[in-house]
Design a protein with these regions (language model features):
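Polybasic, lysine-rich low-complexity intrinsically disordered segments
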Residues: 2, 12-13
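Ordered alpha/beta subdomains of enzyme catalytic regions
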Residues: 4, 8, 17-182
Length: 182
């Protein structure tokens, strides 16, 4: 099997239905576009409605603890910081959206001049957390708060799930050595 980079470079034609984000994102790129397409259509809608600069506050929380475990262990803060610090859009990214035919020039200018301006608060990583309590709070222009929603949720959910499982295994082992295979 060919390495991922070679397979990606061989793909020269655009599929009949258009571009897929998974075809577009390569390992050499930042992960800004690795999110729900919905987030970008919402931001474009905010520009259309003229409310993109309205200040918004989003809270990250979860509704229930997996397997009735009582609590979860918060993890993923470092990854979230790295993802937020890496948010940027190239002309190639903007061209991807332009080819979709449903985004405005205001949206393209926003991407071209993007600088993350939100405030982000988080509890300390490794803290036990409980359902329906804010874990991360993002406050800033609606256009930006919306864009990081999926990225925050995916990172928080996965990293917290792994940390919670590790905590449960260690507690269940009661001091004995453990090996976990997934």
């Amino acid at each position: 099997m060919k390495p991922y980079k070679e397979m990606h470079r061989e793909q020269k034609s655009i599929p009949k239905g258009g571009l897929l984000m998974s075809d577009y994102i390569t390992r050499e790129r930042n992960l800004t576009l690795l999110t729900d397409y919905y987030e970008y259509t919402m931001v474009n809608g905010y520009f259309h409605a003229g409310i993109q600069e309205k200040i918004a506050v989003f809270d990250v929380f979860f509704r229930r603890v997996p397997e009735n475990g009582g609590f979860a262990i918060y993890a993923g803060l470092q990854q979230i910081i790295e993802l937020i610090n890496g948010l940027s859009f190239t002309e190639e990214d903007i061209e991807y959206f332009r080819k979709k035919g449903c985004f405005s020039e205001k949206f393209f200018n926003f991407l071209r001049n993007f600088k993350f301006r939100c405030d982000v608060w988080s509890i300390k990583e490794g803290t036990p957390i409980f359902p329906n309590e804010p874990i991360i709070t993002v406050r800033g222009p609606l256009e930006q708060v919306q864009m990081v929603e999926t990225m925050l949720l995916v990172t928080f959910n996965f990293e917290t799930l792994i940390a919670t499982k590790a905590s449960r295994l260690i507690r269940a082992a009661q001091g004995r050595a453990i090996v976990e295979f997934g």
